[in-house]
Amino acid sequence: PKRDSKNYHDSPLLGFRSQLDERIWWTQLSLNFISGTARGVKDLSAFRYYKLKERFPKLNDNFCDANKSYLNKYADRNPENGAKFFGSTTAFVATTDLWHLSQFINHTTMFVSMIIPLYPSYDRRLNWKEIAGRYATIIGANAIGYHWAYDKQFRF
């Protein structure tokens, strides 16, 4: 049977009021899992690149190894020569190496997931238990994504 806002179950922990509300929550969880995964990849490229290289031997060290790739934003990979191209040290730095790309994905997905619930109009506000429940599950999804990327995929 199709559920709508009139007969939808009212979750005491998360406060779902409609299928749309539940879909928004699942979207937030998914975005935060991606965010956590990107954060894990970023930290791997900075602190345990050798594990990434073991798993993916064809990785380009100049793009993926944070100890080398930060030079990609500079002309001839030399900071004294200035930016490699317009925005390579500012607005477009995410295109220069894996660390910055992962950070961009981490921040973008996190911010988008926080903005999503601001737009639908609801007939009532969430109570403190519902807010705490949603916050806990969303932060949990981010932590699971990080743990999955940083620890589980590259066992230490």
Language-model-derived ranges and their functions:
Residues 3-156:
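Cationic, hydrophobic amphipathic alpha-helical membrane-interacting segments
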